Amino acid sequence: MAKFRVVHYLNQFFGQIGGEEKADTAPLKKDGPVGPGTALNGAFKGEAEVVGTVICGDSYFAENMEEALKQILSMIKEYNPDLVVAGPAFNAGRYGTACGAVAEAVVKNLGIPAVTGMYPENPGVEMYKKSVYIIATADSAIGMRNAIPKMAALGLKLLKKEEIGTPEQEGYIARGIRKNYFAEERGAKRAVDMLIAKIKGENFTTELPMPAFDRVPPNPAIKDLSKATIALVTSGGIVPKGNPDRIESSSASKFGKYSIAGVKDLTSDTFETAHGGYDPVYANQDADRVLPVDVLREMEAEGKIGKLHDYYYATVGNGTSVANAAKFGQAIAADLKASGVDAVILTSTUGTCTRCGAAMVKEIERAGIPVVHMCTIVPISKTVGANRIVPTVAIPHPLGNPALPADEEKALRRKLVEKALKALTTEVEGQTVFD
């Protein structure tokens, strides 16, 4: 019997192209397994083989999703596969989003099964769990050894058209799909057993979990910008030189509050990024590419805004848990309200950074302050629940373009900030993207 044919999708890191400096790599293909594909091949135990690997840089995919998907699907089709495996992506936000999008596109457009793997808090999970099977993994590559066999086993079941068990049995993340099944015990007995366990304070598992919805209604728009105090917040890790609060480069446990009173421009001598989730070169050259102090100072001088708040707030969103992001957002919102801030511009960079930023956006919104999220990976911001969103240039320089002359780059940044201010002065009823 012929072996099933499998194509493996990887990012630039696991595809052995390079690190963050190669995140802009366009899609390419290689015959046979690459990197973790070798372990995947072994996990199939001779029933299937990885005939080809498609590799794409995380930033390239995030910034060119539609075109990247076309290229990737075309490359996958050349191998005539029976199954596509993507990742695992663990807690890497851009990678998870790409894995989910590729798997979904394969199922919908090629009509073949696909499997991926992610940490449950990866933003790609919320975006794609209903359309593809996602094996639950650890938050880092240390969990590769456990993830690969589970992905291979589920892939083989899909190939053989065998019945897929529950998430607990197979190891995939619950998809929100309910199915009738025959239980060994009657419903009345199961219900009473559950009630007794609850009364005793023992653990029990409901048979009908309810979906959790956490949407915050948008606040009314700012009526008069010329009298408004605008504050800057970022999950992009911009800190004073030396990172005085020692904010972690990943999975941050804190945020910082820093004075920009009298500061007209963020220079390389005084500000840098502490963020470990994107190439820091461009932000270290000019932190205004992540935190647009320069153009907001000009607008303040011109009377377009009443005042730029004397402090900005920063954390590192890379890998930061949703719980911590919400906690940061609540604390920042309380400080903003106490300071009389009228509106907030919040900027984000990479995938989990965008998730973190959007989680903070919701808490600031919940506190009654209108806020706009400026980010490159708009789908993540929408999935988490930001209301006013402005798409930006690129992950490592959301509010700049190093390829442009300085004056043109600043003009580009100003145009983006003007969009953000327009968003803050526009009434919206729900999520709105200001292109």
Swiss-Prot record:
Source species of the chain: Carboxydothermus hydrogenoformans (strain ATCC BAA-161 / DSM 6008 / Z-2901)
UniProt subunit comment: Heterohexamer of two alpha, two beta and two gamma subunits. Component of the glycine reductase complex, together with components A and C. PB is substrate specific.
GO cellular component: glycine reductase complex
EC number of this enzyme: 1.21.4.2
Keyword set includes Phosphoprotein: no
Family: Belongs to the GrdB/GrdF/GrdH family.
Function: In the first step of glycine reductase, the substrate is bound to component PB via a Schiff base intermediate. Then the PB-activated substrate is nucleophilically attacked by the selenol anion of component PA to transform it to a carboxymethylated selenoether and the respective amine. By action of component PC, acetyl phosphate is formed, leaving component PA in its oxidized state. Finally component PA becomes reduced by the thioredoxin system to start a new catalytic cycle of reductive deamination.
GO MF entry, a single one: glycine reductase activity
Active-site residues annotated for this sequence: U350
Name of this chain's protein: Glycine reductase complex component B subunit gamma
Key words of the record: Oxidoreductase, Selenocysteine
EC category: oxidoreductase
Catalytic activity: acetyl phosphate + [thioredoxin]-disulfide + NH4(+) + H2O = [thioredoxin]-dithiol + glycine + phosphate + H(+)
Highest taxon listed in the record's lineage: Bacteria
InterPro entries for the chain: Gly_red_sel_B, Various_sel_PB
